[in-house]
Amino acid sequence: MNSFEKKILILKKDDKDSFIALVKQLSTKEKQILFDTIDSRIRKLQTIYLNKPFNLKFLQTFIKEDSDEDDDDEEDEEDEEDSDEEEDDDVVEDDNTKDIGKSRDSDKSIKGKEKGKEKEKEEIEIIEQRYETKVIPKKPIYKDQQQELLQQLQLQQLQQKPISPIKDNSGVSYNTSFSSLSSLSMSNSTSSSLLSTSLLSASLLSASSSGLSTSSLSSSINNSSNNNSNISSSPLSSSPLTLSSSSSSSSPLQRIQSIQNLIRSNSLRTSLSSSSSLLPNLIQLQQQQLPPPPPSQQQQQQQQQQQQQNNSMLQQSNNNNISPRTQLLNNTTTLLPNNGLEEIFNDSNKIGEGGQCSIYKYMGTAMKRFKPSLSSSLISKEFENEVLILERLNHPNIVKIITYSTIERIILLEFIDGNSLDKYPSQSLPLSPSSSLPNPLKVIQDFQQIVDAMIYLHNEIGIIHFDLKPSNILKNSKNNKLKLIDFGISKFLNNNNQNNNNNSLNMGSYRYSPPELLCNNNQNNNLINKSVDVFSFGIMLWECLNWTLPYESLSREQVKQIKTDMERESHLPLDHLPKGIQDLIRLCWKHDPSIRPSFIEIRSRLSEIILNNIPSLNGRQFWISSSKYLQQNDDSLINNNNNNNQNNNNQNNNNNNNNNNNNNNNNKDETTSIIIYESIPWLKFKTFLSNHLNIYRQSSTSNSNSSFNLNNNSSRNNQRQQQQQNNRNRSVYNNNYNNNNNNIINNNNNNINNNRNRNYNAYYEYIFDYIRYILKVIDEKRDEVSVIEFSRFCTFFSPLISSSLFRSIQIFCDIPGLYGYCLKKDLILSSSMITLMSKIGYLIFIDPNNINQLFLKMKAPTSSSSNKNNNNNNNDNNNPSNFIDFTIRVKIGNYNQRIFQCHGHTSSSLSGLIKELQPLIDNNNSGNSSGSSSSKKSNSGFLYQKTPISEIKDRHINGSYLNQNYK
């Protein structure tokens, strides 16, 4: 990095004044070096802090001013020296010799000045000619620049000089004519309404040379953009338009710059309607009002042939509704030579390589270059096929094309920062670090994106991918979005008869190809359809669920024999996978293509897998059994049924059997397909928690001064009835899911409406806020839970997720007064702990960041209340005033030996540790009952700790979480 680059990096972003001041400080030589060293690297640096491409206009003015000042100083010094010499000569020579000497010196000085100015002009012209073609600013040409161009061209017309093509130092000329069409076209991947600056500058040149003003040109452009009725509106991109090279040889600088122009053209490309309508008008305007210089006979013949080809292709495109760009793929002029691109195509920029192409990262794009060593005919067909298909596609899970070059066979694609799915283990960690298999939940989440992309290809565009495999799917490391790539051998469904030849049957990877592609029989040609991708999808799903290459160490013939004999499961076992996934993969592997499901059916099956409880081996269960609230009717039906559901709860419950019998007949219009939301409103999620998570199930008596009481006894009774109804609904849902969908939906809507305005007790609110903090939904502006956060909650908190992790917690949840959050390790508690649960309620937390600390949110009876309970068996034990709530931190010294430590006490079981801490609890209770505050201070390290998460950021510091004794 030179000194100039260091100075550029120091400047702040958008600080144009500082940049101009920096250039002014440079000497003339430094400025000249600046112009000589401006390449992609310095342009990148300048673009970073100015957020715009490099502009040489104002730099050229600085160089010109400084060079004039330096030359003036040198000339003044020479004049002074000459004057001194002349004075000395005047003493000796006579008047005649003096006059002769002065005239000669003046002539020399004038000639020297003229030569110096001519050299300066030549140098400036060389610099302008060399870099003017390189710079493509992202903003349109300003009025002052347009006036300068018009003035220059008017002077040339007055002198009757033809417009000379732009030349660089290598002698390559660039013609501004629109008669030749090249491969640099405007893709329809973006919908920008601006033309590229090269198009505007070329149109200005043609208009100004023909005598048109800038206003008339702009009006013609606007009028032409509206007259697009006669232009084909095919899904392909607009017609190509660029400046073509007049010779096949050019400098490496120009070749690199051509690729840079290809990349920059993406930000200023036109829409389909505007570009397609503007192109014929510009060509017509150029032909009518700007006649080219008289060409030679060879040029006339070439132009006539090219015009005939263009006319024939335009007629064919109008008849077949195909864009002219598709027909002109093989007839483009030389844009990028075949050699001298070592700066781009080197190993340091390579990010991927396949059998037929290599991918390089260059200027923020992915440059796909087909290998020149392969057969040109096959590669050209694959190249044209991929370009033709990519320009028709527009889906968030399919890679987007920027532009391409037919001569170099280069395709510029959007860059995706991530790896392919064949490197899946490095991107997705399993649920347990000791497990050798991935988390099926994560795999299914990712594969839903692939299914959406394939539904778009099959049903909306009509394309068969033919090469669906993990290496052709990229995963963005930033947003986890999947992108489908590599459409070189893809086919259109309506051209099966033309494309399904013997060569196409052998295409694709044999590990993922179906049997009908591996058998070269003419009878199988009719069987090649969309089911080819379904078979590959099943193999790919198995690979990502097992992290194992299918048919590893087997040859093509062996794999072919296995697939034709239908012995796949002997090599690709499925028994260890959840049953729903087993059935789906077996359907995708059917030998008969007509039996294989479509991707729409696959999507519905994946949704059912998500909504059902799917146990796997080793006690691991994934996803959520209680996520049935995601299955709902349309929003309009939900809104219309809200009021009815509130008033007709009993009626709906009594008519459950009738609804179950009439699901398929009477209620077809009310049921809809399964809907998986991208985000869940917090209100629905809170209702879901209250209905399905049994948090502290001991009921509280009415007490107006306690934060635990509900509004009244009736609301408490309704809550109990509602909870019992929810339990019955869950059992019905788990046992009769397919028969009770409508009943569950109605009851779930009832629960949402009944609980929407309900006041939860303090423990409910505490757990809600704790979960809300974990899900990072604290901000009031962000009142939704995303799917990723929802899955994180289920992975960390749901008792249905873990292996031995939640076995003991599942037992605890059946005991009133206990609910546990156990995140990382296994806790096995003794039977004495269960006995202790009848008197003490617990909320168990394990810190996700520190698994060696266990937090117990305890609710223990006070000493006075315990004496009353021993004497009288009444309902006073439910009075919150007789209980005290506190939190203790327990240190887990050794999980294997079950060593629990707290406040200097150690035990091999958690129940034993609590028994040892019971005297401290009793002393604290008695101190609180007497109103003493000394016990709080003495036990500050043991009780009343603001954890977990500092009591949810001290949100309810006034005691709304706990009873009045807690402060």
Curated annotation (Swiss-Prot):
Record InterPro entries: Kinase-like_dom_sf, Prot_kinase_dom, Ser/Thr_Kinases-Pseudokinases
What Gene3D superfamilies does this protein's entry cite? Transferase(Phosphotransferase) domain 1
Catalytic activity of the protein = L-seryl-[protein] + ATP = O-phospho-L-seryl-[protein] + ADP + H(+); L-threonyl-[protein] + ATP = O-phospho-L-threonyl-[protein] + ADP + H(+)
Q: Which GO MF terms are attached to this record?
A: ATP binding; protein kinase activity; protein serine kinase activity; protein serine/threonine kinase activity
Record's compositionally biased regions (Basic and acidic residues): 95-122
Tell me the lineage of the source organism: Eukaryota, Amoebozoa, Evosea, Eumycetozoa, Dictyostelia
- Residue numbers binding ATP: I351, G352, E353, G354, G355, Q356, C357, S358, I359, K368
Q: Which organism is it from?
A: Dictyostelium discoideum
This protein is called what? Probable serine/threonine-protein kinase DDB_G0290621
Q: What is its EC number?
A: 2.7.11.1
